[in-house]
Amino acid sequence: MSSHESPRLLFVHAHPDDETLTTGGTIAHYVARSAEVHVVTCTLGEEGEVIGERYAQLAVDHADQLGGYRIAELTAALQSLGLRGPRYLGGAGHWRDSGMAGTPSRGRQRWVDADLDEAVGALVAVIGEVRPHVVVTYDPNGGYGHPDHIQTHVVTTRAVAAAPEAVGWTVPKFYWTVTAISAMTAGLQALGDVPSEWIRVNAEDIPFGFGDDQIDAVVDVTAELPAKVGAMRAHATQITVAPDGRAFALSNNIALPVLGEEHYVLVSGEAGPRDSRGWETDLLAGLDLE
């Protein structure tokens, strides 16, 4: 790497709001430290459920205009995190949000049905352009099993593997963004007052997450919570944030904590120094950027 090279990170996400919910604090953290941060979004999020009545008729079973509206939400969210406007894989609208398992096709190519050679090639081209030191996407289950998240995992994994030969760039560190069961448990237990219509749950009711022994890295995003919460509020058709900014809910009204840490599993590359828990505290740890 060249002398005094600026660190470059690439986050690959399925829909608008995923970048904020899973990695928003990390994005803001590295932007604040003058890293070059890129976010690629694979669909417009057309199949999302809409919170509230104001824009409810944008949904797929009415005007089917939600995807276009969510471009503005994603733009505002990225600005809150310190970035410019969105970048969509293949161009805005090239692949459609697939919806949850069992959602019917809407007449355009769904992301879950994307030709893998085309999709991987598009992301390889981004990797060749950005030459990221770190790439982040979902685990094989897509976090919670959403078909588009799983497809994003497959495409990103194949693109990282293909990039050395295709564009001459080997990604030094490749991570999955994951939920730490311990952090979620503590966050749920610490929840204060939430809107009366929200549903409180226990950690055992959330069917995904990783144990501490499976986690390789954590980023303390406490200082970035105002930026993350601002980005969450920008995704107003998808996320409701509690007045105090410490909890949020999606369209299912399940109360979830806004956590001050974001957790990762290192898939490939050499880990840097680890703390007493065995975790890196910097996704760039171990990289020689001088």
From Swiss-Prot:
Its EC number is 3.5.1.103. GO terms for molecular function: N-acetylglucosaminylinositol deacetylase activity; zinc ion binding. It catalyses: 1D-myo-inositol 2-acetamido-2-deoxy-alpha-D-glucopyranoside + H2O = 1D-myo-inositol 2-amino-2-deoxy-alpha-D-glucopyranoside + acetate. Binds 1 zinc ion per subunit. Disulfide bonds: none annotated. Keywords: Hydrolase, Metal-binding, Zinc. SUPFAM superfamilies: LmbE-like. The keyword Hydrolase applies. Its cofactor is Zn(2+). InterPro entries: GlcNAc_PI_deacetylase-related, LmbE-like_dom_sf, Mycothiol_biosynthesis_MshB. GO terms for biological process: mycothiol biosynthetic process. Gene3D superfamilies: LmbE-like. Zn(2+) binds at residues 15, 18, 149. The keyword Plastid does not apply. Coiled coil: none annotated. It is an enzyme of class 3 (hydrolase). It holds the Pfam family PIG-L. Catalyzes the deacetylation of 1D-myo-inositol 2-acetamido-2-deoxy-alpha-D-glucopyranoside (GlcNAc-Ins) in the mycothiol biosynthesis pathway. HAMAP family: MshB. Belongs to the MshB deacetylase family. This is 1D-myo-inositol 2-acetamido-2-deoxy-alpha-D-glucopyranoside deacetylase. It comes from Mycolicibacterium smegmatis (strain ATCC 700084 / mc(2)155) (Mycobacterium smegmatis). The gene is mshB.
